[in-house]
Amino acid sequence: MLKEFKDFAVRGNVVDMAVGIIIGAAFTTIINTLVNEVVMPPIGVLLGGVDFSDFYLLLKEGSKAAPYESLAAAKSAGAVTLSYGIFVNACISFLIVTFVMFLSVKGINRLRAKEDAAPDPAVRECPFCCSPVSVKAKRCPMCTSELK
């Protein structure tokens, strides 16, 4: 049983998946930093100096009466909030990650297409009956039409 587990654990697919998960976690940190520190501040400036991470709806006041200066102040007062600004940041992060993954997969598929390009086919289609015919054939074996 231990040998079977060892064979499973060191099999190529499991190791590849583990490496992918670790790289994905690191990539997520990079994207979150990109969104929170690079993308959102200019958008906030364009919208009048707004910080999206501080957008929230107050559901219930805390020990200190509202209004609160920021989401952090509301949370420290024990207020119950709906923090939709953090959700907006998460949605933007998701869109960036999916777009980068789309571009990555598209590039990889383009490279694979060049590698997987098949040589000229050994078969062509008969123009009369549409059946497959050898490229070397002078007549179609199905309809006996002469081929050029």
Swiss-Prot record:
GO cellular component: plasma membrane
Main location: membrane
Domain of life according to the entry: Bacteria
Transmembrane segments: 14-34, 85-105
Keywords of this entry: Cell inner membrane, Cell membrane, Ion channel, Ion transport, Membrane, Transmembrane, Transmembrane helix, Transport
Membrane topology annotation: Multi-pass membrane protein
GO molecular function, one term: mechanosensitive monoatomic ion channel activity
Primary role: Channel that opens in response to stretch forces in the membrane lipid bilayer. May participate in the regulation of osmotic pressure changes within the cell.
Family in the record: Belongs to the MscL family.
NCBIfam families: mscL (TIGR00220)
Subunit structure: Homopentamer.
Protein name: Large-conductance mechanosensitive channel
Species whose genome carries this gene: Chlorobium phaeobacteroides (strain DSM 266 / SMG 266 / 2430)
